[in-house]
């Protein structure tokens, strides 16, 4: 035990789901939970995590390698850079978790926490039903202008500004 208290927990995309799970293990130590476009619901066909989850134990390393090459060819260089920094095992396992229908969904876990919670959108990913749904569950919604899902790449200064607003 590191004896940490008043931790500010941040997560993006699939990392948001990890942050939701971690918060469930130690909510009493968490001061606030800040998420940027996390996975709240199981990934569906057409999402990258769904595609990666379709790989098998036998071929996921070579398939992820092929996906990186495809993305690096100009299709999505940011995603290629991200995947290059992941262990293939981690990419495969979190993607498989992202498609599962959970006994307690990440969305329900996020709604249940009693700490301040924030959900940050990039304005280029809107509209979203969650823009109206999340505040009904006492979640503060913030928007980063001139950014989509990859807001830390697309507008890092804007993201910093919005995160600072969440810390006030």
Regions found by a protein language model. Name each.
Residues 1-7:
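Conserved acidic catalytic loop of the alpha/beta-hydrolase fold
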Residues 9-11, 36:
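Short beta-strand immediately N-terminal to the catalytic nucleophile in serine-hydrolase-like folds
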Residues 147-160:
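Catalytic histidine-centered segment of alpha/beta-hydrolase-like enzymes
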Residues 89-143:
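Conserved serine/cysteine hydrolase catalytic core
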Residues 11, 15, 19:
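Gly/Ala-rich beta-loop-alpha elbow adjacent to hydrolase catalytic centers
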Residues 20-24, 30-62:
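Flexible "cap/lid" loop of the alpha/beta hydrolase fold
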Residues 44, 50, 58-112:
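Conserved alpha/beta-hydrolase catalytic His-Asp/Glu region
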